[in-house]
Each structure stands twice: as C-alpha cells, then as structure tokens.
Amino acid sequence: IFINVKCSLPQQCLRPCKDRFGQHAGGKCINGKCKCYP
C-alpha cells in the first residue's frame, strides 16, 4: 500500500507505516514514495 510520504531511504518509511498499520508493518521506499506492507 503506497502512502503519501516522500522518502530516499527505506528507514524513513518504517515509522509512518508502523503509525498507520501497527507494529508489525514493514516499509520500503519505491520511486521516492513509501510503500507499506501491513
């Protein structure tokens, strides 16, 4: 699931993804945007 958060590193996506989808969520940075894996 893509969220509207800009990124340049995967680590930048972990916190926003966890905030939205819970502690077990993961995140990657794809084409400058965060993609969450709930």
Swiss-Prot record:
What InterPro entries has UniProt attached to this entry? Scorpion_toxin-like_sf, Scorpion_toxinS_K_inh
Which keywords does this chain's UniProt record carry?
Disulfide bond, Ion channel impairing toxin, Neurotoxin, Potassium channel impairing toxin, Secreted, Toxin, Voltage-gated potassium channel impairing toxin
Cysteines paired by S-S bonds: C7-C29, C13-C34, C17-C36
Return the Gene3D superfamilies for the record: Knottin, scorpion toxin-like
Spans traversing the lipid bilayer: none
Q: Where would one find the signal peptide in this protein?
A: none
The reply to whether Disulfide bond figures as a keyword in the UniProt entry is yes
Tissue range of expression?
A: Expressed by the venom gland.
Which parts of the sequence are marked as the site Aromatic residue of the functional dyad? Y37
Q: Where is it found, in Gene Ontology cellular component terms?
A: extracellular region
Is the keyword Oxidoreductase assigned to this protein?
A: no
Give one GO term, molecular function aspect: potassium channel regulator activity
Superkingdom is Eukaryota
For domains, the record's comment is:
Has the structural arrangement of an alpha-helix connected to a beta-sheet by disulfide bonds (CSalpha/beta).
Family per similarity comment: Belongs to the short scorpion toxin superfamily. Potassium channel inhibitor family. Alpha-KTx 02 subfamily.
Protein's recorded name: Potassium channel toxin alpha-KTx 2.10
Q: Which organism is it from?
A: Centruroides elegans (Bark scorpion)
